[in-house]
């Protein structure tokens, strides 16, 4: 049995710069990983079978991103003659990241499967090939596959590696799940934030264009941010529902965590520019 990190991410800023004819929104965002997340347990099989041993309530196994990623890699490696005969896997997951939280849990799970099985099966696909496969599963998957903090443009698929400060974060989940379309379909969502260079953006105060909509539509998000903002700079990650506050030290973050209201599920984690998944491969 092998064990693989599937880390969370934060969007340190997120700006919506437009909307394409196909409905997708163009954006500029800054991804950084956390040293906190799910763990995937993978046992290679030799009969060509893919088994997910920890199904998710309400999601058919074949629709789960974990299984879809495994089958996608199997198909791509097979078609290019790089899949050893009988390659398969038993996969289970220790879930710590909430669904609909804006921490990238599902995308991270898919990326971990692609990277781990490529290694375990010895398929030999490059990171570029894995990232291209990952993009077909979701716009956030490639950053997890590549494993380095990044400035993202387009619909999130154009990535430039960056090294923002590795701060400590108090991340809080207010107890609601926010489907991404709820935010992106809101008519009041800002959709024309001017595009700026990464150098300019890194010098500006960070914010998230989705935050005003999440706070308006979900009072729990508004309450969580109102509480966090009493202690430190705080904002929404992704389209929510998680919010985070940034601190220079772990002790400062933990002092605030001790004061968290009972209705708020929160944890402290360090921002890291190299994914814990990729540290495993070094």
From Swiss-Prot:
Enzyme Commission number, as recorded: 2.7.1.148
PANTHER family listed in its UniProt record: 4-DIPHOSPHOCYTIDYL-2-C-METHYL-D-ERYTHRITOL KINASE, CHLOROPLASTIC (PTHR43527:SF2)
GO BP: isopentenyl diphosphate biosynthetic process, methylerythritol 4-phosphate pathway; terpenoid biosynthetic process
Keyword annotations: ATP-binding, Isoprene biosynthesis, Kinase, Nucleotide-binding, Transferase
The protein's name: 4-diphosphocytidyl-2-C-methyl-D-erythritol kinase
Signal peptide (from-to): none
Family: Belongs to the GHMP kinase family. IspE subfamily.
Quaternary structure and partners: Homodimer.
Highest taxon of the lineage: Bacteria
Primary enzyme class: transferase
Function: Catalyzes the phosphorylation of the position 2 hydroxy group of 4-diphosphocytidyl-2C-methyl-D-erythritol.
MF terms in GO: 4-(cytidine 5'-diphospho)-2-C-methyl-D-erythritol kinase activity; ATP binding
Pathway: Isoprenoid biosynthesis; isopentenyl diphosphate biosynthesis via DXP pathway; isopentenyl diphosphate from 1-deoxy-D-xylulose 5-phosphate: step 3/6
Kinase found in the keyword field: yes
Entry annotation: catalytic residues: 9, 140
Amino acids binding ATP: 98-108
Catalytic activity field: 4-CDP-2-C-methyl-D-erythritol + ATP = 4-CDP-2-C-methyl-D-erythritol 2-phosphate + ADP + H(+)
């Amino acid at each position: 049995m092998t064990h693989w990190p599937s880390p969370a991410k934060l969007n340190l800023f997120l700006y919506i710069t437009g909307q394409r004819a196909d409905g997708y929104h163009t954006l500029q965002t800054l991804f950084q990983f956390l040293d906190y997340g799910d763990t995937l347990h993978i046992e290679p099989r030799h009969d060509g079978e893919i088994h997910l041993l920890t199904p998710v309530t309400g999601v058919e196994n074949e629709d789960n991103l974990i299984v879809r990623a495994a089958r996608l890699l199997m198909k791509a490696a097979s078609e290019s003659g790089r899949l050893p005969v009988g390659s398969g896997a038993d996969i289970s997951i220790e879930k710590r990241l909430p669904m609909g939280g804006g921490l990238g849990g599902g995308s991270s799970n898919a990326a971990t499967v692609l990277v781990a099985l490529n290694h375990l099966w010895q398929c030999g696909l490059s990171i570029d090939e894995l990232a291209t496969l990952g993009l077909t599963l979701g716009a956030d998957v490639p950053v997890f596959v590549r494993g380095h903090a990044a400035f993202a443009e387009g619909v999130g698929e154009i990535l430039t590696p960056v090294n923002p400060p590795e701060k400590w974060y108090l991340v809080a989940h207010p107890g609601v799940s926010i489907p991404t379309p709820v935010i992106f379909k809101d008519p009041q969502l800002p959709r024309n934030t001017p595009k700026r260079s990464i150098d300019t953006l890194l010098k500006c105060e960070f914010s998230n264009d989705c935050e005003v909509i999440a706070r308006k539509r979900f009072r729990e998000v508004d309450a969580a941010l109102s509480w966090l903002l009493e202690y430190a700079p705080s904002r929404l990650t992704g389209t929510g529902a998680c919010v985070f506050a940034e601190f220079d030290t772990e002790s400062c973050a933990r002092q605030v965590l001790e004061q968290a209201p009972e209705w708020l599920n929160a944890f402290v984690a360090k921002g890291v520019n190299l994914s814990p998944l990729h540290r495993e491969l070094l």
